[in-house]
């Protein structure tokens, strides 16, 4: 039987009622599509309104830069003339492709970009009109052509100017070294062409092949067959490897000799024992004798004392 308390604990509980909310809350969140779509459309409009003249100037500057890189000018003035168009090109690209957020009126920004491209174009034209030109190997005066005239033979590479530095050839010679020149005649000719035409260097290059030959001969001597050491023959054992050495051989003795030996050993032992006994006896006798002598002396002394007292 369940008590009243157990019935309250295990009985069915009534459901708890929660009151409903009376007020209503309306949340108004701005939509993301309305903010993203206009910005994308504005970017497309700005790209469509870019001027065509600026793209033409950019193509001209890029072609000139490629020709300058192919020709490879050596003088300082020519290097300065090639660096300035590249600077104008960098200014143009930075003004055309500026990844900044669109703020304010888009039409005003496109007008400012047009003004910047016009200024860059005027600066490039004035720079080439003052007498600067593109470096070329076939030009009549100083290896420079005015702007606008193409190179007559752009595919043929120019000969090395004496003022230019031959750093790639020197670097190759330093890496290879004099002792590691190629062995074939064709490769030797190529190596001689790469070396600079100086008398001291030519003398050192002529003396380098015997050194290389000596170096190779040393390598061949070292790479010869190794010395073979003479192996000593193994020790010939008189018994099998599994078994141990044979026992030591004793001298052959007859039984009579064995008996004689045993008897002599016994006699020696007896003699030793007798010697010990005799020593003991002698010691005892000596003691007794000493004692007897002492007693006799004492008696004499006593008798002498008694005789003297009687008198």
Swiss-Prot record:
It comes from the Eukaryota. Coiled coil: none annotated. Residues 213-222, 291-305 have a biased composition (Basic residues). Residues 48-61 have a biased composition (Basic and acidic residues). It holds the Pfam family POM121. Residues 78-97 have a biased composition (Polar residues). Residues 48-99, 186-229, 291-311 are annotated as: Disordered. Signal peptide: none annotated. Belongs to the UPF0607 family. This is Putative UPF0607 protein ENSP00000382826. It comes from Homo sapiens.
């Amino acid at each position: 039987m369940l008590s009243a308390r157990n019935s309250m604990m295990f009985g069915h509980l009534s459901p708890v009622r929660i009151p409903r909310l009376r007020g209503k809350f309306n949340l108004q969140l701005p939509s993301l599509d309305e903010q993203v779509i206009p910005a994308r459309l504005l970017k497309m409009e700005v790209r469509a309104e870019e001027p065509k003249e600026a793209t033409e100037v950019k193509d001209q500057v890029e072609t000139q830069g490629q020709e300058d890189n192919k020709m490879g000018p050596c003088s300082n003035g020519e290097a300065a003339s090639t660096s300035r168009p590249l600077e104008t090109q960098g200014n143009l690209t930075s003004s055309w492709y500026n990844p900044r957020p669109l703020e304010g009126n888009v039409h005003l920004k496109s007008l400012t970009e047009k003004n910047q491209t016009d200024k860059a174009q005027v600066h490039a034209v004035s720079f080439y009109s003052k007498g600067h030109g593109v470096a070329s190997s076939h030009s009549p005066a100083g290896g420079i052509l005015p702007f606008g005239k193409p190179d007559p033979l752009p595919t043929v590479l120019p000969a090395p100017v004496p003022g230019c530095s031959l750093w790639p050839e020197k670097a190759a010679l330093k890496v290879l070294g004099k002792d590691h020149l190629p062995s074939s005649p064709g490769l030797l000719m190529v190596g001689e062409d790469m070396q600079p035409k100086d008398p001291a260097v030519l003398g050192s290059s002529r003396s380098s092949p015997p050194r290389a030959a000596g170096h190779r001969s040393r390598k061949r001597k070292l790479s010869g067959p190794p010395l073979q050491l003479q192996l000593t023959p193994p020790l010939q054992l008189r018994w099998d490897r599994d078994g141990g050495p044979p026992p030591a051989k004793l001298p052959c003795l007859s039984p009579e000799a064995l008996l004689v030996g045993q008897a002599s050993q016994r006699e020696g032992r007896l003699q030793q024992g007798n010697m010990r006994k005799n020593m003991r006896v002698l010691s005892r006798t000596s003691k007794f004798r000493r004692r007897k002598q002492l007693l006799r002396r004492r008696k004499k002394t006593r008798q002498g004392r008694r005789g003297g007292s009687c008198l």
